[in-house]
């Protein structure tokens, strides 16, 4: 497969994993008036990129992709357990698990999934997003760095889609916000690539609190 097509396929919002159903706490941040306009939205997303994703989520995703790319199944299992244990709230755990399950079902139905990866997937009883993403990257011969870039882009695109549904934020304003955030997206990838997964960690208290509050939110559009 053409490498550019494979990358676009992985990053596409049409990938049937249900990412549009989740806001990762952003809906509650809007509900609590923490995010009220493009400026506060940019601060929220920028903080998530540099203080949470770049320090923990992205290095862990990259470790999944690197292990899957070379078929180091023991290492992949280890970082997978680390990822699973790091979900701070019920809905964040359910989000990752549901999207991982959808990716598992997708990959199992593809003829290009190689035998070793298929065997690993069949033995996986509790898939999650990072694991499925890494195996999709292996299947479509996407490098770990490109897979990380696709994951970061998908995350940003999803956050902007949430904003357009919860704020008075139009498509042109969302594109201006994208332009402002792209340098931070690049910085997040650079920082994540330099981070070892063993001491990696983050203390995103605001995200955890928003997620916990969202679990009890009376009226909501998103599952997280």
Curated annotation (Swiss-Prot):
Belongs to the UreF family. Transmembrane segments: none annotated. UreD, UreF and UreG form a complex that acts as a GTP-hydrolysis-dependent molecular chaperone, activating the urease apoprotein by helping to assemble the nickel containing metallocenter of UreC. The UreE protein probably delivers the nickel. Keywords: Chaperone, Cytoplasm, Nickel insertion. It holds the Pfam family UreF. Signal peptide: none annotated. One of its GO terms (cellular component) is cytoplasm. It is found in: Cytoplasm. InterPro entries: UreF (IPR002639), UreF_sf (IPR038277). It comes from Pseudomonas syringae pv. tomato (strain ATCC BAA-871 / DC3000). This is Urease accessory protein UreF 2. Required for maturation of urease via the functional incorporation of the urease nickel metallocenter. PANTHER family: UREASE ACCESSORY PROTEIN F (PTHR33620:SF1). The keyword Chaperone applies. GO terms for molecular function: nickel cation binding.
